Amino acid sequence: MQVIGRGGANILIDYGDPTWLWRCCIRWPDLLSSNNSYTIKNISYIKDYVEPLLHGLLCPMYLIDVDIEAIRPILSDFILNLDDKVVKVIKIKNLTNNTSNLILNNHFLKSYCSQNLQTVILELKPKWLYYDTDYCRNCTHNAFKGRGTKYCYNQLLMNPAHLELIFGECNIFPVKFKDAMHEYLRNDNNIFKILYDLQKKLTKNTTPISDIKSINDVNDEHLLLMTLRDVTCFIEWNSAENALHVNIIDVDLKPKEKWTHWTKTYSQLTSSQKIYHTSNK
C-alpha cells in the first residue's frame, strides 16, 4: 500500500488492486472524524448535484469504510488524531492502469501511453472554459503565476486546430489518435463544450466574485460553479476501437471558506498584466 498522488485536500492510495484506488480526504490535519464527516457530505454532493450534469462522464466512484488499522501507517503522516475506527474512503476507478509511460507532464496536461502506443491517455485540467471578463482568465492566471503555457483550452474549444499547440513538439502520438481527437472536438457534445455551457449558465446566475464580501454571499450555485472550474478530465484512446472514452474526476464540494482565496485571486488578476484572445467566447 502506497500513496501515489497528493493534492491540497486528498491523497490517492494504491492498495494493490490495479483497477481501483482509494481517495482519502486530508483537508483537516487535526482530526480524522472531520475528514470523515466531509467525505460523507462530499460523496452525496457529487452524486446528487454534480453527476446529473455530466452526461454519464463522471468517473465510477463510491463510498466505502476501511478499518483504521489497515490504513494507519499512511494516514498518520497526514492526520494528527486518528479518532475514528474506520476511514471514509472514496473508492475510485484507476484511469491509468493500462499505461506505463508518461509522455507529457506540465501544470494542465499529462499524457500517458502503453508500451506499444496502442493506448493513449490525456489528463487535462481545463479550468475556466467560460469567463465573463474581456481577458482570458486561464492565460492571465498562468502569466501571473509565471507559467509559460503556449496553449489554452478555451482556444481549443473555439478551434480544434489548437490541438497541435497542446501536443507541441511531441511527435509520438499516433495519427489515428490525433484524428479521433479532432473529430471529437468538432462534436458539440465534447467535454469542453459541456463544461463551457455549464460554467456559462452558472456564471450568469451567481454573484460575481468581485461582489462577494462575506461568506454569506456564497451560495450553493457558486460552489457548484467553482467545482466545475476545477475538474480533471481523462480522455482515453485505444487503437482496437479507435474510439475515445472520457471520465471526469476532482468534482469535490468546495468549502465556503475559500471565498477569501477566490476574491484575493480576482483582485490580483485585475491589477496584473492581462492576456487577451481575438476569439474568446
From Swiss-Prot:
GO biological process, one term: inositol phosphate biosynthetic process
One example GO MF annotation: inositol-1,3,4,5,6-pentakisphosphate 2-kinase activity
Record text about domains: The EXKPK motif is conserved in inositol-pentakisphosphate 2-kinases of both family 1 and 2.
Motif EXKPK motif positions after renumbering to this chain: 123-127
EC number annotated for this UniProt entry: 2.7.1.158
Protein name stated in the entry: Inositol-pentakisphosphate 2-kinase
Substrates-to-products reaction catalysed: 1D-myo-inositol 1,3,4,5,6-pentakisphosphate + ATP = 1D-myo-inositol hexakisphosphate + ADP + H(+)
Entry keyword annotation includes Cytoplasm: no
Compartment annotation: Nucleus
Transmembrane segments: none
Main location (coarse class): nucleus
GO cellular component, one term: nucleus
Record keywords, A-Z: ATP-binding, Kinase, Nucleotide-binding, Nucleus, Transferase
Protein family: Belongs to the IPK1 type 1 family.
